[in-house]
C-alpha cells in the first residue's frame, strides 16, 4: 500500500503598506501665478479684523474693550466700598418695597414694571456682537506713546 501523506504549508507574503495621496481639486491657475500664491487664504470684505490684531475671523467670539489709562483700580473694586441700607436707586428701592408684599402681589408688580419698560419708546440698540468696535482713538494713543 502506498501511503500518501498530505502536508500543509504556509506561505507568507509581505505587503508594502499603501500610502493614500490626496490632491486638491484642479483649479484654473494662470501661468503667471505660482502655486504658493494660489494656495493662500483669501478673506472676503465682510470678515472682521479681530481687535486690531490682524487676526481675521468670520465671527466675533468675544468683545474686547481696552483698559482706559485714566481708570483708578480702587474705583473698579466694589468690595472695598460699604453699601448703605438706604439705596437711592429705583431698582433696589423697588425690590425693598417688594418685601412688604406676598408672592402674587410681587408678581403683579413685576409684570407692571415690565409693561412700563416696554412702553418706553427707545431706539433699538444693536447687539454688541453686531457692531465692530471703533478703536481709532485707542490706536492714536498707542501710536503717540511709541
UniProtKB/Swiss-Prot annotation:
Residues 107-120 have a biased composition (Basic residues). It is found in: Nucleus. The keyword Lyase does not apply. It comes from the Eukaryota. Its main location: nucleus. Residues 24-40 have a biased composition (Polar residues). Disulfide bonds: none annotated. GO terms for biological process: glycogen metabolic process; intracellular monoatomic ion homeostasis; mitotic spindle assembly checkpoint signaling; regulation of protein localization to nucleus. GO terms for cellular component: nucleus; protein phosphatase type 1 complex. Keywords: Nucleus. The keyword Nucleus applies. InterPro entries: PPI_Ypi1. GO terms for molecular function: protein phosphatase 1 binding; protein phosphatase activator activity; protein serine/threonine phosphatase inhibitor activity. Belongs to the YPI1 family. Regulator of type 1 phosphatases which maintains protein phosphatase activity under strict control. PANTHER family: E3 UBIQUITIN-PROTEIN LIGASE PPP1R11, E3 UBIQUITIN-PROTEIN LIGASE PPP1R11-RELATED. This is Type 1 phosphatases regulator YPI1. The gene is YPI1.
Amino acid at each position: 500500500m502506498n501511503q500518501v501523506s498530505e502536508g500543509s504549508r504556509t506561505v507568507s507574503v509581505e505587503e508594502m503598506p499603501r500610502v493614500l495621496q490626496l490632491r486638491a481639486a484642479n483649479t484654473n491657475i494662470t501661468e503667471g501665478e505660482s502655486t504658493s500664491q494660489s494656495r493662500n487664504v483669501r478673506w472676503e470684505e465682510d470678515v472682521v479684523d479681530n481687535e486690531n490684531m490682524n487676526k481675521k475671523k468670520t465671527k466675533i467670539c468675544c468683545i474686547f474693550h481696552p483698559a482706559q489709562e485714566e481708570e483708578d483700580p480702587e474705583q473698579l473694586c466694589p468690595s472695598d466700598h460699604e453699601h448703605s441700607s438706604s439705596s437711592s436707586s429705583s431698582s433696589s428701592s423697588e425690590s425693598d418695597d417688594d418685601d412688604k408684599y406676598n408672592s402674587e402681589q410681587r408678581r403683579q408688580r413685576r409684570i407692571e414694571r415690565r409693561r412700563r419698560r416696554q412702553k418706553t419708546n427707545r431706539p433699538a440698540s444693536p447687539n454688541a456682537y453686531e457692531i465692530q468696535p471703533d478703536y481709532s482713538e485707542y490706536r492714536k494713543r498707542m501710536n503717540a506713546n511709541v
